[in-house]
Amino acid sequence: MSRGCPENNNFLTNNNQMVLDMILYPLIGIPQTINWETVARLVPGLTPKECVKRFDELKSCGSSPVDNQYNPLMAAGEGPVETLATYIKSSLLDAQGDFQETPVDQDTVSKAGRHSIATTRNCSSESENCTARNAGEETGDSEGPNMVIHVCDEAKSLKEDFICPRDLLISEMKYFAEYLSVDAQRWEEVDISVHCDVHIFNWLIKYVKRNTKDSKDCELPALEPGNVISILISSEFLKMDSLVEQCIQYCHKNMNAIVAAPCNMNCINVNLLTRIADLFTHNEIDDLKDKKDKFRSKLFCKKIERLFDPEYFNPDSRNNAATLYRCCLCKKLLTRETERRISCIPGKINVDRHGNIIYIHIRDKTWDVHEYLNSLFEELKSWRDVYWRLWGTINWLTCSRCYQAFLCIEFSHCQYHSEVVVYSSAVNSLNTVGTGIYPCCNQKVLRFDPTQLTKGCKVRDHMVLLHDQGENDDSLSCPTAKILDDLHKHKDVIAVPFLKDPVSDPGVGSCDEKGLEYEILLEPNTPWGSKTGELNAFLSLKNWTLQLKQQSLFSEEEEYTTGSEVTEDEVGDEEEISKKQRKKEKPKKFTKPPKKQLSSPCSQKKEKTLEKSTSRDVSPFVVSMQKNKWDATRSLRFNQDAQREDDQRRMSEITGHLIKMRLGDLDRVKAKESKEFAGGIYSRLEAQVKASVPVTARQNSSDKNQSNIPQRHLFNYVHSNFIRNSQKLETSQMFIN
């Protein structure tokens, strides 16, 4: 009976082996690679290794192992063997990439509203009247069998069936690739049910068949303001990438008509919202006519998120808020780009190695950006205004009047004096040479001010000149011009009113003798040969406490002693007499503790300058250098004691400074902890619930709720909300993981 190998009779006793031989025989002699996993799926109960082994046996035999009783069936021209061979060559060899495609996880797909909720189920293999099987008999060489999709519209109580070729459905709607790309399902019947709006899915099927022969005479479906949102959500769920891009572009061009149409904009997920917002500039969003605020606030919220993205190139802002912080000294909001351009208090001025003045800000550890944004929203009542205020906080310009860099929110803070400064002549007063006074506010000023800080009693708008315009006078081509143009358009929201700060802005407003910014100390008889009445190069400024603290480290005072003022190794009585005289000259200094003296070095410096003897009338800088030198005329024991006293004084000051820094951090942490609610998490949740309800609604419903809901139930209400929110959080984390 067998025309091939002797084991063929054993194979023919099993129908699965016969089907495997019918599949493998047409593949003999084909150079292409065979996907054995796909072949094993076609025949139940076989593994890929068994298929490879049987294929090698068939190649060694060289003829078909099927018995003669099946020859009449295989000899027919349109028999199932030739049809099967055609199918194997087209699917197992040409379309191997489809089987290696990564399946789509249905659980991770977001389902918004009632659109495009698809389910698949396997029909019974014994059913002979399945619709999908009847439709699948009309197969094409390129598009495969037709698939029937049952659409159920619960809102309109409608049901309709749509027919689409399998390959076309997979290529356009990639959501169905998981269920229709496996060839083993060709042997079973597949039924697809979609819960969606019938008219929307009809539009989608027409779009899928736009390039087929049947649709040449049909009109291509067009997007409209009334259906684009539903089509966008459905196409994004079905993974129709080209249609999603078309819908996003259409939304960008026709957003005014879309928000005016009766459509639900809340179904748009975060990914689609981000892609739509990236196409808009902030001026385009600001020009949207959204009376009901259906979508504009969401776009501005997404723009705010983009301002905090350090990796995103923002065409609307040359700076980002990723490094935003607040200085605990000047209370200004700064970023890494603006911290060295914006001035701090005069005590934090420094000079770099190139001679340029730089500013050193100290980060406020208690400031939180989330609390700042929430406070801005409570103040401005609109996310649009919050965006523009934040945009003005991180962008800066340079004024051509005061030559100072300023934040856009400080556009109206250009300080100036209404009258010209008047300098006194040397004949009138020797003590005021090089200083002047503004008659408008009686503020004293140096002729040559090393701080270069512009102060004034009045404020006005800054003036910015554009020097980098293009050849065609396109002023908006440079970033500075764009920032200035946006600042002028939204000045009412961005600019904040000027508030006088006595710490950082002491020169604004009326100045009396007590509130002067500088305390000028003139030393006519300087030891380095200056003329009478000439200013010292190291002028002592009132607010420059940093220099005074540095000089105090080199000054030698009597309160820092080790108790060995007079030693046994001292030679001569003149030293003991001079020490006793110096001790009698300053008897009051030992009454104050050293800590208080360390805390106020400025006041000590003023007292010490008055108590200096005539023999020590030189500059404090020169004195400090002389006092810390090794005195060869003194004994070794005296110099060692002086060195130990100096080391002890320095360590005391360092310890006090470290303690002050540590206590400062603790105070900031305690201040942050004091902001927390005393009642814990439940009181905070209660405050959030009350804050989320509008004021008018709370006032209207306060009388009803007061009589119906007792106060003792408030804890249970907040507790139930807390448990519900915790369950939602755990569920979301489970899907994320």
Swiss-Prot record:
It holds the Pfam family BTB_SANBR. CDD domains: SANT. Residues 147-255 form the BTB domain. Residues 555-576 have a biased composition (Acidic residues). Residues 555-618 are annotated as: Disordered. GO terms for biological process: isotype switching. It comes from the Eukaryota. GO terms for molecular function: identical protein binding. Residues 580-595 have a biased composition (Basic residues). Residues 604-615 have a biased composition (Basic and acidic residues). Residues 21-59 form the SANT domain. Homodimer. Interacts (via the BTB domain) with HDAC1 and NCOR2. Belongs to the KIAA1841 family. Negatively regulates class switch recombination or isotype switching in splenic B-cells. The BTB domain is important for homodimerization and for its function in negative regulation of class switch recombination. This is SANT and BTB domain regulator of class switch recombination.
